[in-house]
Amino acid sequence: KKYNEAEKLFSEHLKSQSNHAKTIEYLGDIAGHQKDWDAAITNYKKLKVSYPKNANYWYKYGGALGMKAKESNKFKALGMIDEVEESFLTAAKLDSKHIETRWALVMLYIELPGIIGGSEKKAQKYADELMALSKVDGYLAKGYIDVYFSRYTKAEINYKKAHEIGNSKTTFEKLYDLYLNKLKDKTKANKLKREFENK
């Protein structure tokens, strides 16, 4: 309900200032929250066309397009993948410190079948770039890749390193989930939980 009210306000504001970037971005964000990918795509597209050097607009556009592709049938999704990849790559080029875009590329290259551009090598490249920007993100990304390929022992090493540095809810959840659901090691999972709750 709050989103609907906000959407009305922003839409009204846009009538008087049709090119107000922040307003267009908010409308895109609201649409994204409501999983209205078409509206999100339309708003972010306006922004990336008007501000082609803004990495965040490219990232958000690629993200909304990627979510739409995930919910579309296979043939339709195939036609969208190149543009999703291109948007993320543009964002990464425009901003060498953009963490979210590098995460998006890691996930994209890991989840895509090899025949349409998926590649562990490419995913590792962006995991390395993440490592240079933030050790926690780097280890989490490498752990994510290991989990995807069922290399759970390697994933444990990476997730443990991420947790030692970050000691956050995110690093805890990744390692805990690995122990509990992948390595099926309740003892390790419970020990980790106790340590995290008593820190």
Go through the PLM ranges and name each one:
Residues A21-K22, A55-N56, I99-E100, K135-G138, ...:
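Helix-start (N-cap) detector for alpha-helical repeat units in TPR-like alpha-solenoids
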Residues S18, P52, S96, A132-K135, ...:
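Short coil turns that delineate tetratricopeptide repeat
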Residues A31, L65, S72, Y109, ...:
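Residue at a conserved register position within TPR or TPR-like alpha-solenoid repeats
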Residues Y3, W37, I81, E120, ...:
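TPR-repeat structural position
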Residues Q34, K68, L112, G117, ...:
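Structural motif corresponding to the intra-repeat A-B loop/turn of tetratricopeptide repeats
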Residues K22, Y26-D29, K60, A104, ...:
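Canonical tetratricopeptide repeat
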